[in-house]
Amino acid sequence: MTEAWRPDGDEPRGVSGPFRVRVPAKINLHLGVGPLRPDGYHELNTVYHAISIHDELTARRGDTLALTMEGEGAGELALDDSNLVIRAARALAAHAGVPPYARLHLRKQIPLAGGLAGGSADAAAALVACDALWGTGLSRDELAGIAADLGSDVPFLIHGGTALGTGRGEAVSPVLARPTVWHWVVAVADGGLSTPVAYRELDRLRDAGAASTPLGSSDALLAALRQRDPRVLAGVLGNDLQDAALALRPSLAATLKAGEAAGALAGIVSGSGPTCVFLAANAADAERVAGELSALDVCRQARTARGPVAGARVG
């Protein structure tokens, strides 16, 4: 039985643990970027899709709030209050009126600054793990409400699956479609790209008349998902930030060309990049495309993934 932390900070009784939470990476099947808003964000119309590349966060009892980390790019991340994991834990504690005491350990597989929402995923994992550890008993929607203040992608990664994102991306509604498994190849580049820098570059390209026509509505993408045909879906994948990512990292054009030459149905830059994702017709084709990309000097690594998968979950 789990008992919540008491607001007076006394030692709780009956809290079990550790709690391990797996959280997926995110790709955008459609990323329509509108004009810059007065608050400094862009209005988005995006379709999020959770894929089977996961980080894992373990939460244990502690007498302070501490974070350790291993895996993909772990040495490049701060472990203090600037880290989204720590910020998420503190936000949940403040919301629930409990002291933020936990020992958190993060195993990373999602590349840093790769357009896969790795930091947002870890924040979602922290909310779910600490909710379990502290017995705060919040619903998914309540956790997503806290998540919205941490980052635009964080609410989606609480839920997972496939979802429509509007506003700055934080307003999430699930996409209702018959269950389908989509097969992806994820080509990870060396280094990362800053999301704010990518948005500023898109604004610059648009001001100069050098950007593609904005994608706008995601209706065609949502209709393609309902058809459950990868070839139809391939024809409507799109990302307004791709122009910016290619301008900032021209080598990504060779990655996209190589993936499609290897047999992918379509390839796009994931989010703000520099990761590229390719849709394959089936699992065997995905393995073959990943193998061919791995043999070329166009990405740091290529791995297969499937989607959609669940969001942050204990287990």
UniProtKB/Swiss-Prot annotation:
The EC number of this protein is: 2.7.1.148
The UniProt keyword set, sorted, is: ATP-binding, Isoprene biosynthesis, Kinase, Nucleotide-binding, Transferase
Which reaction is this enzyme known to catalyze? 4-CDP-2-C-methyl-D-erythritol + ATP = 4-CDP-2-C-methyl-D-erythritol 2-phosphate + ADP + H(+)
Q: Which GO terms describe its molecular function?
A: 4-(cytidine 5'-diphospho)-2-C-methyl-D-erythritol kinase activity; ATP binding
Instruction: Indicate yes or no for the key word ATP-binding.
Output: yes
Pathway of action: Isoprenoid biosynthesis; isopentenyl diphosphate biosynthesis via DXP pathway; isopentenyl diphosphate from 1-deoxy-D-xylulose 5-phosphate: step 3/6
The UniProt entry annotates the active site at: K26, D153
Q: Known Pfam families for this protein?
A: GHMP_kinases_C, GHMP_kinases_N
Residues annotated as binding ATP are: P111, L112, A113, G114, G115, L116, A117, G118, G119, S120, A121
Gene Ontology BP term (one): isopentenyl diphosphate biosynthetic process, methylerythritol 4-phosphate pathway
Q: Which EC class is the enzyme in?
A: transferase
Function in brief: Catalyzes the phosphorylation of the position 2 hydroxy group of 4-diphosphocytidyl-2C-methyl-D-erythritol.
Q: Which family does it belong to?
A: Belongs to the GHMP kinase family. IspE subfamily.
The record, for HAMAP family, names: IspE
Would you tell me the protein name for this molecule? 4-diphosphocytidyl-2-C-methyl-D-erythritol kinase
Organism of derivation:
Salinispora arenicola (strain CNS-205)
